[in-house]
Design a protein with these regions (language model features):
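Small-residue helix-packing motif on alpha-helices
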Residues: 30, 40, 59, 193-200, ...
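Internal alpha-helical scaffold of NAD(P)-dependent oxidoreductase catalytic cores
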Residues: 101-112, 128-165, 176-214, 255
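Hydrophobic packing residues within well-ordered alpha-helices of enzyme cores
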Residues: 15, 19, 40-43, 78-82, ...
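Rossmann-like NAD(P)(H) cofactor-binding subdomain of soluble oxidoreductases
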Residues: 31, 37, 56-131
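NAD(P)-dependent Rossmann-like dehydrogenase/reductase catalytic/cofactor-binding core
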Residues: 202-257
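NAD(P)+-binding Rossmann beta1-loop-alpha1 motif at the extreme N-terminus of oxidoreductases
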Residues: 1-54, 58-61, 126, 188-190
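Short pre-catalytic strand/loop immediately N-terminal to key active-site residues, enriched for Gly-Thr
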Residues: 113-114, 162-167, 219-224
Length: 257
């Protein structure tokens, strides 16, 4: 089956990388398209044998799956150019563009559509990817679930939850990076080298997520285990709350919707 990826910017490029690294081009004829020849050449330099084009319409022609990974304000002009049919599965990776808008753009009332929101970790097959569907068959749903399930974890949700979930998984990865950056900066100020602070921070995060993933504990339970009475950790936790850490995280998530 031919699979077209329209747009190879930050997210579209990450999707391409994830698929190529996973070897999915052994199962799909993947063609990447972008208006920027420079972006395509950068992709081609990494993956020389892959098909690329600056002609979006040519990329989408005869494709069973068309993944449109362009900025939300570019969805309308790009999709109108593709002239897709109801025989093609349309996958939109554009936050905030709902199914009603997509149907209006395509002019097709029964086209199988998926809204898919990954995060940039999809390039390393570690994405948390959100999927919702419209006018799709069981077979089409299984196909898309398997496709993105190979690139991390997936969560099937109704469209009504897409904005909230996007703020946690797709935007949230940037907030995690922000914490990592702050932790490394703190380590340097405290006398560690950047490399030492980076190692300590990343492994600590890995350990924390492993505990929660493997044992299903509530974060508060694990915090309590570390905070001994009169100890240094509870002092740090109290300082975080004094400085508005919890409120800042919640407000960032809400602002992202």
């Amino acid at each position: 089956m031919k699979l077209a990826i329209i747009g190879v910017g930050n997210m579209g490029g990450a999707v391409c990388e994830g698929m190529f690294r996973k070897g999915m081009d052994a199962h799909y004829q993947i063609m990447a398209s972008d208006a920027s020849a420079e972006k395509l050449e950068a992709l081609k330099a990494q993956y020389p044998k892959r098909e690329i084009t600056t002609d979006n319409k040519q990329a989408a022609k005869d494709a069973g799956i068309v993944i449109v990974a362009v900025k939300p304000w570019l969805v309308k002009p790009v999709v109108e150019q593709l002239q897709m049919s109801e025989n093609q599965i349309y996958v939109s990776i554009a936050a905030g563009v709902d199914f009603a808008q997509l149907e209006s753009i395509t002019g097709l009332k029964n086209q199988p559509m998926f809204r898919v929101i990954p995060n940039t970790a999809i390039s390393d097959q570690q994405s948390m990817t959100l999927i919702c569907k419209c006018h799709t068959s069981t077979e089409q749903e299984a196909l898309i679930n398997e496709l993105f399930g190979c690139l991390g974890r997936i969560l099937i949700i109704p469209e009504s939850k897409m904005a909230a979930a996007t703020s946690i998984s797709s935007c949230g990865i940037a907030y995690v990076f922000k914490y990592i950056q702050a932790s490394i900066q703190a380590g340097i100020e405290l006398g560690l080298t950047a490399q030492e602070a980076r190692l300590l921070t990343l492994q600590t995060l890995t350990g924390a997520t492993t505990i929660l993933s493997e044992h299903g504990e509530h974060p508060a339970t694990e915090i309590e285990k570390v905070c001994t009475p009169g100890g240094i950790t509870i002092k740090g936790i109290n300082q975080l709350e004094h400085d508005g850490f919890t409120s800042a995280v919640i407000n960032a998530m809400k602002a992202s919707m």
